[in-house]
């Protein structure tokens, strides 16, 4: 289970070092194999441990590609999915096409969201956090039945 946000740097080759607190889990669970793809509706990337990604692939395979929305999801998620192996220093090299999708600069955020990570450009992440906080403060959001009885 991944949680928390880490500020990281991309080197000149587009690599970043996975923080140690996550690295050990990734290495023990899937020998350091991860899948990175584009997020469907935000300017960031999704990074999954291999086992988590295989579950998603299985679910995507079960939906009909005759439905335009399903086909778009399959095309975006599977067509951009790139497999990586953490190197001996715990780094991941992000493909230029993935970096371009998320408009990643030198500073990035690796955000743990339980079964996956999001990878954001750091400035854009902070902007998104301000927007999300303001929307919640104003109560300007769609009702959702799963959240009706959710308390913190």
Curated annotation (Swiss-Prot):
Keywords, A to Z? Cytoplasm, DNA-binding, Repeat, Transcription, Transcription regulation
Question: Which PROSITE patterns does the record cross-reference, listed alphabetically?
Answer: SPOVT_ABRB
| GO cellular component labels | cytoplasm; nucleoid
Q: Name one GO biological process term.
A: negative regulation of DNA-templated transcription initiation
What Pfam families has UniProt attached to this entry?
MraZ (PF02381)
State where the protein is found.
Answer: Cytoplasm, Nucleoid
The UniProt entry lists the main location of this chain as cytoplasm
Q: Which InterPro entries match?
A: MraZ (IPR003444), MraZ_C (IPR035644), MraZ_dom (IPR020603), MraZ_N (IPR035642), MraZ_sf (IPR038619), SpoVT-AbrB_dom (IPR007159), SpoVT-AbrB_sf (IPR037914)
GO terms for molecular function, please? DNA-binding transcription factor activity; transcription cis-regulatory region binding
SpoVT-AbrB domain ranges (all copies)? 5-52, 81-124
CDD domains hit by this protein: MraZ_C, MraZ_N
For this chain, the family text in UniProt reads: Belongs to the MraZ family.
What quaternary arrangement does the UniProt entry report?
Forms oligomers.
Supply the HAMAP family for this chain: MraZ
Q: What is this protein called?
A: Transcriptional regulator MraZ
């Amino acid at each position: 289970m991944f949680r928390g946000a880490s500020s990281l740097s991309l080197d000149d080759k587009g690599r970043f070092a996975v923080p140690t607190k996550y690295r050990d889990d990734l290495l023990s669970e899937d020998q350091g194999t991860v899948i990175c793809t584009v997020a469907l509706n935000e300017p960031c990337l999704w990074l999954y441990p291999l086992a988590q990604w295989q579950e998603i692939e299985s679910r995507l395979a079960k939906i009909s590609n005759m439905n335009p929305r399903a086909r778009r999801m399959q095309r975006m998620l599977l067509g951009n999915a790139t497999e990586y192996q953490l190197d001996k220093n715990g780094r991941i090299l992000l493909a230029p096409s993935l970096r371009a999708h998320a408009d990643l600069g030198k500073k990035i955020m690796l955000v743990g969201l339980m079964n996956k990570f999001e990878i954001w450009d750091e400035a854009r992440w902070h902007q998104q956090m301000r927007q999300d906080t303001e929307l919640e403060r104003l109560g300007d959001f769609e009702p959702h039945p799963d959240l009706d009885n959710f308390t913190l």
